[in-house]
């Protein structure tokens, strides 16, 4: 739990790079980028790892990136959803526990969990495990009606909303996530994609 939220709170925001349908078949990898910022203003650094498309290593790679980084004063982990590289689902409870930090999941469009579960059951032998991870993320809260949603682990909803607002700059998406998205898409496709 966070006692006091400062405007320059150290946040790491993770997003993944693009990948093709062919990547899904071959189980290729895509990049995972974590952008470390002080609030919404100063970029402090960037961490990267490679994760398997539709794999099971996103959680482990995030934990590894944080533990092996020089950024020891991080206070919050932000995720742009909990599915990375297709259906490489993050175990947000494990991520929070192993890093000893709260996790805030920011979502632009409210996910259709039933459709996700149906797709998982149709295409994955480990569907039940992935579905369980989806539900571990907790209740989906609406921050901006029809435009921005979030989930919070290890931090109150009020604090999560305050942190989201503190880290927004020129977009509804918090700046660490927006920049992670731009960097990851540029690495994978040669140029950044619009958020």
UniProtKB/Swiss-Prot annotation:
Belongs to the UPF0215 family. This is UPF0215 protein TSIB_1161. HAMAP family: UPF0215.
């Amino acid at each position: 739990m966070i006692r006091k939220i400062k405007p320059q709170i150290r946040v790491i925001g993770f997003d993944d790079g693009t990948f093709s349908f062919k990547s899904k078949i071959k189980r290729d990898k895509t990049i995972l980028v974590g952008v470390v910022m002080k609030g919404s203003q100063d970029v402090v650094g960037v961490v990267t790892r490679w994760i398997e498309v539709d794999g099971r290593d996103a959680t482990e790679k995030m934990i590894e990136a944080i533990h092996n980084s020089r950024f020891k004063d991080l206070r919050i982990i932000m995720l742009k959803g909990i599915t990375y590289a297709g259906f490489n689902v993050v175990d947000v409870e494990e991520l929070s526990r192993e890093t000893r930090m709260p996790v805030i999941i920011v979502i632009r469009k409210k996910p259709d969990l039933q459709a996700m579960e149906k797709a998982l059951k149709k295409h994955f032998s480990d569907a039940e495990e992935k579905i369980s991870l989806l539900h571990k993320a907790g209740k989906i809260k609406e921050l901006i009606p029809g435009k921005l949603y979030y989930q919070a682990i290890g931090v109150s909803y009020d604090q999560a909303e305050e942190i989201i607002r503190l880290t927004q700059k020129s977009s509804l998406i918090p700046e660490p996530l927006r920049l992670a998205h731009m960097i990851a898409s540029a690495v994978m496709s040669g140029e950044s994609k619009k958020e």
